[in-house]
Amino acid sequence: MVNIEEWQPKTKLGRLVKEGKITNIDEILSNKYVIREPEIVDVLLPNLEVEFMKWRIIRGKFRSKKPYRMAQKKTAEGNKTRYEVIAIVGDKDGHVGVGLGRSSDLLIAREKAINRAKLNIIKVARGCGSWECACGAPHSIPYQVEGKSGSVRVILKPAPKGVGIVADDEIKKIFRLAGIKDVWVRSFGKTKTKMNHVFAVFDALKKLSNVRVQPFFIKFSGYTEGSIINK
């Protein structure tokens, strides 16, 4: 958590946040302002949670999952190790971000991933777009949407209340931190490439806010973007 007294903003947006002239993250995201300082997100979303995507590590007969991927490169000086970390941040109330960090030091890679996830934070459109449910509560997504990253393509479909998040365990983390409780996910392509899988889902969540929604559908589906608790 950032100490707002010690924080010295480097951007105009950061100064406006520190001075208290901007107090809502949705104001920034709705106006498409570019966030260049992770401290802005720390101040406006104090309840932000962090999770790390786990990669499957195979060493001989042993298999395990680790919150990082390690690669080694042979050089004249010897083997050089590089770590890759994917962080997912969210407040479970309509805001989520995903970031990738790389470094020869694991702690630095984690820090880079968290900071980039904060800089990439988006507000997520939620609603009840399932014809089987039609409860009007924002527990799912309002309509079907597709996302793509590399060779991976995903389709997100609204699900009735109680279905839960029907997806891979690592992908579930994005929806939980975004505040989505029920959704169906179909994945195509090389989904074992976890990095592309995660970013394909993130791409789909971004596109939820790109659709022009009619007033009657807003009322019918309980459509909302960003925070519900603070409205």
From Swiss-Prot:
For whether the record's keyword set contains Secreted, the answer is no
InterPro entries reported in the protein's UniProt record:
Ribosomal_Su5_D2-typ_SF, Ribosomal_uS5, Ribosomal_uS5_arc, Ribosomal_uS5_C, Ribosomal_uS5_euk/arc, Ribosomal_uS5_N, Ribsml_uS5_D2-typ_fold_subgr
What SUPFAM superfamilies does the annotation carry?
dsRNA-binding domain-like, Ribosomal protein S5 domain 2-like
For this chain's UniProt record, which GO biological process terms are given?
A: translation
Q: Which domain of life is it from?
A: Archaea
Q: Quick check: keyword Transferase in the entry?
A: no
Q: Where is the S5 DRBM domain?
A: 61-124
Can you provide one Gene Ontology molecular function annotated for this UniProt record?
structural constituent of ribosome
Q: Mind telling me which GO cellular component terms the entry cites? A: small ribosomal subunit
Keyword list (alphabetical) reads:
Ribonucleoprotein, Ribosomal protein, RNA-binding, rRNA-binding
What is the documented function of this protein?
Answer: With S4 and S12 plays an important role in translational accuracy.
Summarize subunit and interaction data from the UniProt record for this chain.
Part of the 30S ribosomal subunit. Contacts protein S4.
Q: Which family does it belong to?
A: Belongs to the universal ribosomal protein uS5 family.
UniProt free text on domains: The N-terminal domain interacts with the head of the 30S subunit; the C-terminal domain interacts with the body and contacts protein S4. The interaction surface between S4 and S5 is involved in control of translational fidelity.
| PANTHER family on file | MITOCHONDRIAL RIBOSOMAL PROTEIN S5
What's the protein here called?
Small ribosomal subunit protein uS5
Upper classification of the source organism reads: Archaea, Nanobdellota, Candidatus Nanoarchaeia, Nanoarchaeales, Nanoarchaeaceae
Gene behind this protein: rps5
